[in-house]
Amino acid sequence: MGRTNAMVSDIGSGIPYSESVFKAVLASGVNFIETAETYDNGRNEILIGNSINKSERERLFITTKVNLSTGLATSTDDIVRSAEGSLKRLNTPYVDLYMMHQAQSVMKVADKNFHKACDRLKKERKIKFRGLSCHGTFWWQEQGGSIEDILMAAIEDGRYDVLFFPYNFLDPEMGERVIQACKSNDIGTMIMKSNPVSVFENYEKIINQGGNLSILEKKDYERKRLQMDKAGNFFRKYGMTDMTELKKGAYLYILSNKDVSTICCRFKNFSDIEMYIGLSGTTLDNPTASLLSDFRESLGFLNCRIGCNICEQNCPGHLPVNTILRYYYYSQALKENESSSALYRGLGDHKADICTNCQGHCEKKCPHNVAIRLLLTDAHRQFSKTT
């Protein structure tokens, strides 16, 4: 894990969902644990704290995060108290890595209160290292550069030991540039959002929407018809009825990059343990590489490249496109519709209902030809069912 010199499992534990599954994950050999104070309002940290035996603490690498955008941690003392609250919930005297959660601008990278708090916490031996995570900018709130700008600024800052960011086979170039810069500066890397959304279900849902579409949506759908036909050919070619093989391939793609420290996987059940742990130490083979390439060519238009933000900068309605499609990713790829809907409600008036009658300024600027309006309107339709 970069300059930390820690030896971490290539498959790490993202948000755990139950003590029994999490204990089985640890028993399988995983020693990297990722959480945050905001995950399930701190209950996720409590779950971890209740699951870990004190005798195994030294072999584990635990990271948690503080969110500076909630308004609850606005001073050095606030951040120190947040860290101490995390330690209490995690039932540990220290965490190996304390991170700034969701850095939203280049300016945030140098946040004085965060760094002062980390210096104090390190001196008190309550944290060992500091890090930063980034999903992309909140361009609609603060024009703070791209996700790559933020990550590169963190590398240049020199105080961050580990970075946590999206990297996947759909749009690897940015991630690989950041990974190489991290390697050159001896910074560890944690990877998130490595697998695509469940496009098979999306594909069937969109195909069957028919008369439920508005006039503009129907026109947009007709423009996508050739792409949808190509998507159908992909599923028929591989006889695919679910995303299992694609998920495996997506993780193998990351594991094949030996400059990546760990991938954070969400183990929801014992079947996930069997699948993800079985991938540890393996790399991508040619047939699977071809599968991923065909998927990118045939179905890349149904997958937003989270963090790109180019489209958001061109939205006349100042819609948080990247954020909405990140919530959509949580719902589609991680099957977390209830929590994703709650996050969507938290956006207030910044909802994707305005996209129904828009001319598609976002899509015209998207370098990946993503069906942004189609995804946004589907996200709004889906999340509004539970609002």
Located regions from the model:
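Structural motif corresponding to the early beta-alpha repeats
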Residues: 39, 54-77, 101-104
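N-terminal binding-site loop/beta-alpha segment at the start of enzyme catalytic domains
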Residues: 1-60, 93, 123, 153-158
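Structured C-terminal cap/extension of enzyme domains
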Residues: 1, 23, 31, 159, ...
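Short gly/pro/ser/thr-enriched loop/turn and capping motifs at secondary-structure boundaries
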Residues: 40-41, 138, 169-172, 196-200
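Residues that line or immediately flank small-molecule/substrate-binding pockets and catalytic motifs
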Residues: 15, 37-40, 99-102, 134, ...
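Glycine/proline-rich, positively charged
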Residues: 20, 73-190, 207-209, 216, ...
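Hydrophobic faces of well-ordered beta-strands that scaffold small-molecule active sites
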Residues: 9-13, 33-35, 60-64, 95-100, ...
